[in-house]
Amino acid sequence: MELIQDTSRPPLEYVKGVPLIKYFAEALGPLQSFQARPDDLLINTYPKSGTTWVSQILDMIYQGGDLEKCNRAPIYVRVPFLEVNDPGEPSGLETLKDTPPPRLIKSHLPLALLPQTLLDQKVKVVYVARNPKDVAVSYYHFHRMEKAHPEPGTWDSFLEKFMAGEVSYGSWYQHVQEWWELSRTHPVLYLFYEDMKENPKREIQKILEFVGRSLPEETMDFMVQHTSFKEMKKNPMTNYTTVPQELMDHSISPFMRKGMAGDWKTTFTVAQNERFDADYAEKMAGCSLSFRSEL
C-alpha cells in the first residue's frame, strides 16, 4: 500500500535570512525567470493587512466597477499570488503566464526576496500596512486554519515569535519600514488599513488617482458597498471557501474573520500589551511611520 506523503505544516525555511513557508521558499528559484511588464501593478503587504480587500478594490477598478466581471473567478485567480506554490495547485508563476495584461499581482515578499524585474520595470505598487497588534492576532488565527504554516502553538508563544520575526515573511517591523523607505524613490502608494476602514471612499479615490483612472460617483458608492467586509465575507469569489479544505480549514477559523481595527484588545493581556509596546518602541525608534491601534 502506497503511503500518502503528509504535506501539511512543514517547518519554515530561511531564504536570505527571511523565514518562509517551505513551498514558497521553493518557488523563489523559478521566480527569478519572472518577467515583469511596465503595465503590471503589484499589491504588496505583510500578511493579514488587507491584501484581499485592496485586491478586490483594484480588480473592480480594472473592471470599471462591474461586479459580475469580478465574480468571473476567485480572487487568487484574478489577482495571482506571485510566490504561491502549494502542492497540487498551480504556482503563482504558472497562473501569471496565463493572465492577460494589465496584470494585478499579489505578494507578501520583503524587498530582499522580490524579483528585481519588478523594480527595474518601475512597476507601480499599492502597499497596505496595518497596526501590528491586529496583524499578530489575525496571523495567529490564520496559522490555525492554513495548513502550509507550522502549528502556531499557544497565543502567547506565537506572539513571541511574531515579535522576533520568526514567522513566515519575517519581521513586520522591517517589512513596513523598508516599503515606506522605497516609496521615496519608487512609485508606491502607501495605504493604511485603519484609514481604509475609517473612510473607504477616500482611500479608493487615492487608488484611482494612483492608477490614472476615474469612475462616476455612483460607481464609487457601489464599489464601497461591494468591497465592504460584510459583502466580501459572504462572497465565495473573495472569501477563499473555494480553496481545498486540506489547505484551508474554515471550520477552525474563517479566512475572513472579523475585519476590524482594534480586535487585538479581546486577545492581548495587559502584560502582553505592555511587553509589545516596549518592543515596538525599540524596533520603530527613528521611523516616521505611525499606526492607529484602534478607531
Swiss-Prot record:
One of its GO terms (biological process) is 3'-phosphoadenosine 5'-phosphosulfate metabolic process. Gene3D superfamilies: P-loop containing nucleotide triphosphate hydrolases. The keyword Cytoplasm applies. InterPro entries: P-loop_NTPase, Sulfotransferase_dom. Liver, colon, kidney, lung, brain, spleen, small intestine, placenta and leukocyte. Changing residue 8 to P: No significant effect on KM and Vmax for dopamine, (R)adrenaline, (R)-noradrenaline and serotonin. This is Sulfotransferase 1A3. Its main location: cytoplasm. The active site is at residue 108. Changing residue 18 to F: No significant effect on KM and Vmax for dopamine, (R)-adrenaline, (R)-noradrenaline and serotonin. One of its GO terms (molecular function) is sulfate binding. It is found in: Cytoplasm. Its EC number is 2.8.2.1. 3'-phosphoadenylyl sulfate binds at residues 48-53, 130, 138, 193, 227-232, 257-259. Homodimer. Dopamine binds at residues 86, 106-108, 146. GO terms for cellular component: cytoplasm; cytosol. Belongs to the sulfotransferase 1 family. It comes from Homo sapiens. Sulfotransferase that utilizes 3'-phospho-5'-adenylyl sulfate (PAPS) as sulfonate donor to catalyze the sulfate conjugation of phenolic monoamines (neurotransmitters such as dopamine, (R)-adrenaline/epinephrine, (R)-noradrenaline/norepinephrine and serotonin) and phenolic and catechol drugs. Catalyzes the sulfation of T4 (L-thyroxine/3,5,3',5'-tetraiodothyronine), T3 (3,5,3'-triiodothyronine), rT3 (3,3',5'-triiodothyronine) and 3,3'-T2 (3,3'-diiodothyronine), with a substrate preference of 3,3'-T2 > rT3 > T3 > T4. Changing residue 101 to L: Decreases levels of sulfotransferase activity; 3-fold increase in KM for serotonin. Changing residue 10 to L: No significant effect on KM and Vmax for dopamine, (R)-adrenaline, (R)-noradrenaline and serotonin. The N-terminus is blocked. The gene is SULT1A3.
